[in-house]
C-alpha cells in the first residue's frame, strides 16, 4: 500500500504543541492497527541540534542509529512504538549542505542551483525516503506559518501533495483560538488570518486543530469552518489538559481518526486506547509522593532535560507515585553549599558538557554517597561520581577529567579516541576533531555483571542503550579505583569501556555512561528509573 501523508503546520504563535498533537494522532492511528511513522522538519540552518545550547533549544534527543535530533522525536517515541532514525528529522542546514555537496560533485550538470527546484526536490526526496514502508507518515513542519525560514519546506510539501495525489495527503493546521476574559468569548480572527497565510502559498488545510484554554464552542467551530473552507467535523477543539496523555482520547472523541481513515479510504479496526487508559488511571491514583533533586547546569529551562523529566514521571507511574522534581543549579551547590541538597528523597545528576558547575556535581555525588541518598548518575553524572570516588575513597586527590583540566596529573576520565559504533565500524577521534557529530552516538550493547543491581533491575545479561559522549573512564587508572571498592557492573560489548558503576554498601547508588531516558515510555517505563524512584520512596521511611 502506498504511504498516506499528514502534514502538520502551526500558525499564529509558536509552542502550540504541534509535536504532542501530531504524536497523539499517531498513537490513535497505531491503536487502529496502522503502521505509523513521524518526521520533524526543522527550518534552522544548523545541520543538527547537536551543538546548540540546551537553554535555547532544549534537549538533543538521540535516536537508536545515533542521530542527534529535535526533542519532538522524543515525544514521538513516547507515544508510538515505531523507533525514530536519522531519516525522521532534518534541518534546512542539512538540506543545503547536501545540495551544495551535490553541486560541487557536478550532479546538477552545470545548472543554476536554486531553492526551486533543487532545495525543494531534496526535501521531497527525504520525506519520501523517511515515509517508505509505512501506512501513514505524519510530517511536522517546525516554526510558524508566515516565517520566511519555513517557506521552502511548505512549498516542497505543497508539491508533494500534488505529486502523490490530494486523496493521499492531509494538511492539518494547529492554530490558537484565544479566550478574551473582558469579552467573555473566544476569538476566531487569528485562525482566519493564519489560514489566509497558508492559502497565500497554495495550501488549503483539511483539518484545523484549535488550541485554547477551553473547549471551543460549537457555534465558533462552525464559524471557523465557514470562513476557512473546512468541513465543520474537521474543526477539532484541543483544550489545555493536566496530562498530555489525555490528548489521544480527546482527539478520538471528536472523530479525528475516523475522518482521516475515511479520507484515506483505510479499512481498519476501532482504536483500542486501553493502554493509555491504564496510564491515566495510574497517573490519577498515586499511592504516595516522592521528591527527586535534579542537579544540573541548564535547570533554568526544564526542556533541556525533557526526556529525563518524562522518564521520572514514567517511573512514578510504574511505582504508583507522584514524582516531584526539585531543580537545583549545580553552581548553587558550589556557592551555597550542600544545604541546597537537603529535603530530597533521591538525587539525579544528568548529562552535560563543559567545566561550569562540575565541582558542584562532584560535591553532590559525595553528599549522596556519604549520606546514603539514592543516586542516579547519567553520562556526566557517572563521570563526576567516578571522579568523586577516586578523590575521596581511592586516594587520587588530584583526580579529574581531561575535559575540565587538560594537564590533570590523574585523568580518571579521558577522551575516547577509538570505539566501535552500532554497526561494528571503528570510529576514531582526537582533540582536534569537530564538535558536531563526533561523539559516541546511538544504541550500543552493554554486558551486565552477575549479582549487580543493574543486572537485577534489567533482568538480563545484555542490554542496548543509547549514548552521547566523547569522554570515558580511563582504564589505566581504573584498577586503583576498583581496588578501593567501586564496582564496575556494566561494560561495552568488547569489554573495553565502562558503562555502569555502583557504589558498594550503599542503599542505591548507580551511575551509567549511557542515556536511559531516551528509551523510557509511559506505557513501559524504564528499569533504572523505576528502581531509582522506588529506592527514593524507601529512603523516606528512614
Swiss-Prot record:
Organism: Mannheimia succiniciproducens (strain KCTC 0769BP / MBEL55E)
Name listed for the protein in its UniProt record: CTP synthase
Activity control: Allosterically activated by GTP, when glutamine is the substrate; GTP has no effect on the reaction when ammonia is the substrate. The allosteric effector GTP functions by stabilizing the protein conformation that binds the tetrahedral intermediate(s) formed during glutamine hydrolysis. Inhibited by the product CTP, via allosteric rather than competitive inhibition.
UniProt key word Metal-binding: yes
Enzymatic reactions: UTP + L-glutamine + ATP + H2O = CTP + L-glutamate + ADP + phosphate + 2 H(+); L-glutamine + H2O = L-glutamate + NH4(+); UTP + NH4(+) + ATP = CTP + ADP + phosphate + 2 H(+)
Gene assigned in the entry: pyrG
UniProt cross-references to InterPro entries, sorted A to Z: Class_I_gatase-like, CTP_synthase, CTP_synthase_N, GATASE, GATase1_CTP_Synthase, P-loop_NTPase
Subunit structure, interactors included: Homotetramer.
Keywords noted in UniProt: ATP-binding, Glutamine amidotransferase, Ligase, Magnesium, Metal-binding, Nucleotide-binding, Pyrimidine biosynthesis
